[in-house]
Amino acid sequence: MLLLLLSCNDKQAKVTTPNVLLSESQMVEIMTDVYILENAINYRRGKSISVNNLKTKGYEALFNHYGITDSIFFDNMDYYNENPLLMKNVMDSVCARFQKMK
């Protein structure tokens, strides 16, 4: 029983807050643009057009636009994925934004 309690405690201790924590609204903005970029990449891939340059340049432009690095983005993705309720809020907001775009 004690082992079970300790293992549960360890899981919660692994959730670390990034040095630069992006707000939910910032994550919604960024994730919306990530989905648009990924769809552009997948479209080109479907047309058998090289996507390496688009992917590299696209993410570089996206991170520059938001004033973040890839490390900040991925640290925040880890943080939000480790907090399912926060990530659900972000993704629900992203979906709502796309619904408004239709």
Which residue ranges define each predicted feature?
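Preference for short coil/turn "hinge" residues that link or interrupt alpha-helices
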Residues: K14-V15, A61
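Bacterial signal peptide processing site
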Residues: N9-Q12
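C-terminal motif of bacterial Sec signal peptides marking the signal peptidase cleavage site
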Residues: L4-S7
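Compact alpha-helical subdomains of small soluble proteins
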Residues: N42-K102
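Post-signal peptide N-terminal segment of mature Sec-exported envelope proteins
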Residues: T16-L37
